[in-house]
């Protein structure tokens, strides 16, 4: 943060023209520094990326198989992304004149977590804390000109949910038939299919009322 907690409080008082923060509040902020909401919003984001493959065959048949798994946490709390890919290619010389092949690709990706209102969080009341004195989530809106009536900014990423799933299938086949030494008949066909599923939930703690949504798209 550019300002200390006490400096922020004095700036709010100056802007509002009233003592939004009392002298006691400012004294406490001098000691504690206040809540740095960035420490709660942001985190280290480890990821893993694993690739495996195999290939081989014989004089008449060859194959290639591969798989990829990617997982990553978001730099914002309660967000993550994952993806899994599988690929299989097979070619076969069935006779002196006929060669066929199949290529398949399957993928699923999943994105979890709601968008966090970082701008609101950075300007929220630094004298407040994520938890109240009883250890429960601090869910009381602040109307002092600091929180602008918005709920505690960590409630949305914690209690709201959003899940976006994308499934993709790409498949193709081909056949080559040698009609003559100088003429080859090539036949191919392919299929591509994408399914999208978007679901979400908004908690009453954040929006006053609960709401759930599910949308499918192909």
Located regions from the model:
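Surface-exposed loop/interface segments of Gram-negative outer-membrane beta-barrel transport/assembly proteins
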Residues: 1-34, 74-81, 85-170, 186-218
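Outer-membrane beta-barrel channels and translocator barrels
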Residues: 47, 58-59, 95, 178-180
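Outer-membrane beta-barrel initiation region
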Residues: 40-45, 54-58
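Residues that act as N-cap/strand-start positions at coil-to-secondary-structure junctions
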Residues: 46-48, 84
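Ligand-site clamp/hinge motif
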Residues: 70-72
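Residues on the lipid-exposed face of transmembrane beta-strands in outer-membrane beta-barrel proteins
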Residues: 52-56, 86-92, 171-177
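Extended, loop-rich substrate-binding clefts of extracytoplasmic carbohydrate-active enzymes
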Residues: 62
């Amino acid at each position: 943060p550019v300002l200390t907690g006490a400096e922020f409080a004095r700036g709010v008082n100056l802007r509002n023209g009233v003592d939004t923060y009392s002298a006691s509040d400012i004294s406490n902020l001098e000691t504690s520094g206040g809540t740095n909401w960035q420490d709660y919003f942001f985190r280290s984001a480890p990821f893993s990326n694993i690739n495996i493959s195999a290939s081989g065959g014989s004089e008449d048949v060859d194959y290639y198989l591969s798989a990829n798994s990617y997982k990553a946490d978001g730099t914002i709390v309660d967000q993550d992304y994952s993806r899994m890919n599988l690929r299989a290619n097979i070619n076969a010389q069935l006779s002196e004149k006929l060669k066929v092949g199949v290529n398949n690709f399957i993928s699923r990706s999943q994105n979890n977590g709601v968008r966090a209102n970082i701008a609101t969080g950075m300007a929220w009341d630094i004298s407040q804390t994520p938890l109240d004195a009883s250890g429960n989530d601090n869910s009381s809106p602040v109307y002092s000109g600091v929180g602008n009536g918005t709920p505690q900014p960590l409630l949305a990423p914690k209690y709201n949910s959003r899940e976006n799933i994308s499934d993709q299938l790409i498949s193709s086949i081909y056949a080559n038939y040698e009609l003559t030494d100088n003429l080859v008949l090539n036949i191919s066909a392919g299929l591509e299919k994408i399914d999208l599923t978007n679901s979400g939930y908004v908690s009453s703690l954040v929006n006053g009322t609960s709401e759930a949504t599910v949308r499918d798209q192909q």
